[in-house]
């Protein structure tokens, strides 16, 4: 098994364990992963994975504090209702700004971050209702705007 395959298997096992909603500490997650054949796991690695995947501690059905994944863990798609939340797309010579409905910016930014750099998006910063987009090539910012408008089926500019 290659390094990438091992990493993918680890991530899948990690997510499967958290879906069980029975692990109250990072140490318990480490022990469960080791029991499932992932020997090179440390508490600090689990801490980074919990942060990366947005895991939170919450009460399960037995009222125990456990780690779990947020319901929206999957990457949203442009076919989902999210595209209806984009209100306006604006830009200057170096940056693109998307205005969204209140509370929708981080979900839309997550979709944009899943695009490849060839789609024109280097990265995003999202607040509550505003997304700052750094284009991968400012000389092609108009092409990136067109791709974003197509993605969200809007002609806003």
UniProtKB/Swiss-Prot annotation:
Family (UniProt): Belongs to the ArgR family.
The protein's role, per its UniProt record: Regulates arginine biosynthesis genes.
GO BP terms: L-arginine biosynthetic process; protein complex oligomerization; regulation of arginine biosynthetic process
Keywords: Amino-acid biosynthesis, Arginine biosynthesis, Cytoplasm, DNA-binding, Repressor, Transcription, Transcription regulation
NCBIfam families xrefs: argR_whole (TIGR01529), PRK05066.1 (NF003457)
Cited Pfam families: Arg_repressor (PF01316), Arg_repressor_C (PF02863)
Any one GO molecular-function label of the UniProt entry: DNA-binding transcription factor activity
Organism for this UniProt entry: Colwellia psychrerythraea (strain 34H / ATCC BAA-681) (Vibrio psychroerythus)
Ligase in keyword set: no
Name recorded for this polypeptide: Arginine repressor
Gene Ontology CC entries for this record: cytoplasm
Pathway(s) the chain acts in: Amino-acid biosynthesis; L-arginine biosynthesis [regulation]
Chief site of localization: cytoplasm
